[in-house]
Amino acid sequence: MAHILLVEDSPEVSMTVREILASVGHTVAEAPQGREALKLLAAGKFDLIVTDIWMPGMDGIALLKEIRGSGNSIPVVVISGGAPNAPLTYTAPLAATFGADKVIYKPFEKDELLRAITDVLSD
């Protein structure tokens, strides 16, 4: 199974995602925002990143820019409730522009998250 870096500022969402991923055998390391995620990414080997977009501190877009700017091609699944004061349709193109492999929206179903992860890991 995969070793996944989860970047999410909401403890509730983080716990939900962690439990879903662990239920199918994935291991999960967690960071509450982008700066901490970059430190974990530099210190360890991950198969995939699952990140929120809109977080305090370094958000998911800035994280994607840093990751892709460094030449790292690790798969990234974005989970987002949408941009503050922007329609949900704004998030997917923005995330894709900066290198996200897949975008899913909160609230999401367990199967939707697992399908997105399976899709990007099999590419």
Task: Give residue ranges: language-model regions.
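Two-component/phosphorelay signaling modules centered on CheY-like receiver
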Residues: 11-29
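Helix N-cap/capping motif at the beta->alpha junctions
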Residues: 30-39, 60
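Active-site beta3 strand of CheY-like receiver
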Residues: 44-50
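Active-site residues of response regulator receiver
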Residues: 52, 80
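Receiver (REC) domain active-site loop signature in two-component systems and cognate sites
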Residues: 55
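Short amphipathic alpha-helix used as the core "switch/output" element in two-component signaling
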Residues: 61-73
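Alpha4 helix (beta4-alpha4-beta5 surface) of REC/receiver domains from two-component response regulators
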Residues: 62, 83-104, 115
